Amino acid sequence: MNGMVWVRVLVGAVWLNGGIEKLLNPEFPQQFASSLRAGGFISVAPPFFQDFMRGAVVPNAELFAQLMRVGELALGIALILGLLTNLAAVGSVVLSIVIVLSQGGVRLGTGLGAPEFLTVNVLVALLSVVILLTPAAKALSLDALLARRSAALSPLLLNRRRANRRRA
């Protein structure tokens, strides 16, 4: 197994772990809603993100908590299995950025998380970009199996062009 497969599985395990923790905590939606409604860390988020948080997320906090559970589980499973890896990698980047912004962005320290929180989420985002751009990350994946069955899917799933075959 190549190193990029391990990177893909590791990033998937980070998301899966977060999703399982949220799933096993029956109080998570209420805790998430309470922390959002307290609003202390929203004020340290970038201004454009504060508007989004106050206008969309806070009024629907329990729904967003459920979406986080499902999203983290889905990203973890997809990356570990290598199923729709490119889409999962994009989702991983987006969710990592949203999490960092919701905690105060690069001015982290006054929000809910420790500096390690910022480091982990930025690292997950960067590794997800590498997964997205690297064909080697799709080895030993369900995407590779699907691409073998349909050559037309290979560029989409594996970031590889179809070989030009000349007819004799």
Per-range role (PLM):
Residues 1-74, 81-168:
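Extended, low-polarity transmembrane helix blocks
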